[in-house]
């Protein structure tokens, strides 16, 4: 299950060279990839073949593509997925075993499920070539000043990272960590997972014993930890705090930074596509727009 480092390096070099090239045309790249996606979806997914039947054969524009909700996709799961040998019942059986978290089903697809915050939980399959791209983006496009910029390199092994999240299901965060540890064994001694459902006392005790240099979690958790640090419940000497999965305003960010005297870096992702956007050194979120197009679908 190891992905050769040379493949990561090649994908990373391509990612960087593409963005820095004077011939880089983002609009054209988006259009080409969007049309390839529509073409393959029509070809391999009965659900999309029917839904996209009225679209033109080529030069499809984003605004022409009908919205598909998670409820709709899950109701038509077996005709939605592009691998006809898979079905929802066997995927749910695989997901029900928490020991499978981070282990690709049939050694081909990494499974991620959403929490259902929008009303319906979703299940998403990521082929391992796509995951390679995620790793390349992680390795090449994080803020230059952040330790995140070293995520898959050996230099990173000197850090101690505490990931605080939901560990009891195939959510994007814990799934990505477990799979990354398989691909890059050096991360096994670098990252410690702690359950968000632990009591406040137990979590504080675990963190004080572990003494991480980095904490990664949701903004709401980071704020609670910052309060504990100020009150002396926590005694941590952090270098950075990484947050994502919830909104983070500037006041919250400054509070966390002040409490820990550490840099705070925000990110935005989803189970559908984990590496959507990351924060730069100037505090702005930048979308990986060569791989994803963000669109407002309604007034909410």
Say what each PLM segment does.
Residues 122, 131-134, 169-173, 224-225, ...:
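Short, well-ordered, mixed-charge alpha-helical segments that flank or form enzyme active sites
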Residues 116-119, 165, 244, 269:
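Glycine-centered flexibility sites
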Residues 1-39, 46, 183-300:
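Active-site glycine/GP-rich loop and adjacent strand/helix microenvironment
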Residues 145-182, 193:
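Conserved AMP-binding loop of ANL adenylate-forming enzymes
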Residues 112-115, 265:
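Short glycine- and Lys/Arg-enriched binding-loop motifs that mark or flank ligand-binding interfaces
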Residues 125-128, 165, 219, 268-269:
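Glycine-rich, histidine-containing beta strand-loop boundary motifs that form or position
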Residues 103-105, 179, 184:
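Short glycine/proline-enriched loop/turn "hinge" motifs that connect secondary-structure elements
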Residues 1-113, 120-151, 155-158, 209-216, ...:
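Nucleotide 5′-phosphate-binding alpha/beta core
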């Amino acid at each position: 299950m190891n992905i050769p480092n040379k493949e990561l390096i090649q994908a990373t070099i391509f990612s960087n060279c593409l963005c820095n090239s004077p011939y880089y045309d983002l609009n054209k790249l988006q259009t080409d990839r969007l049309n390839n996606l529509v073409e393959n979806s029509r070809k391999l997914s009965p659900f999309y073949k029917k839904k996209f039947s009225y679209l033109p054969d080529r030069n499809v524009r984003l605004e022409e593509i009908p919205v598909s909700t998670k409820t709709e996709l899950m109701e038509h799961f077996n005709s939605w997925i592009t691998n006809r040998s898979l079905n929802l019942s066997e995927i749910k059986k695989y997901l029900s075993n928490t020991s499978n978290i981070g282990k690709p089903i049939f050694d081909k697809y990494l499974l991620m499920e959403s929490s259902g915050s929008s009303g319906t939980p979703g299940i998403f399959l990521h082929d391992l070539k796509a995951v390679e791209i995620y790793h390349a983006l992680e390795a090449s496009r994080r803020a230059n000043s952040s330790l995140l910029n070293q995520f898959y390199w050996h230099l990173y092994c000197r850090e101690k990272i505490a990931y605080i999240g939901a560990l009891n299901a195939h959510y994007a965060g814990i799934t990505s960590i477990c799979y990354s540890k398989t691909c890059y064994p050096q991360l096994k001694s670098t990252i410690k997972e702690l359950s968000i459902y632990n009591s406040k006392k137990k979590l504080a005790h675990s963190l004080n014993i572990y003494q991480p240099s980095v904490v990664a979690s949701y903004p709401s958790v980071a704020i609670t930890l910052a309060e504990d640090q100020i009150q002396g419940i926590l005694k941590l000497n952090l270098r950075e705090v990484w947050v994502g999965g919830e909104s983070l305003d500037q006041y919250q960010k400054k509070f966390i930074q002040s409490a820990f005297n550490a840099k705070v870096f925000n990110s935005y992702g989803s189970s559908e596509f984990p590496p959507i956007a990351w924060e730069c050194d100037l505090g702005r979120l930048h979308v990986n727009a060569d791989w994803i197009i963000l669109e407002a679908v309604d007034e909410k």
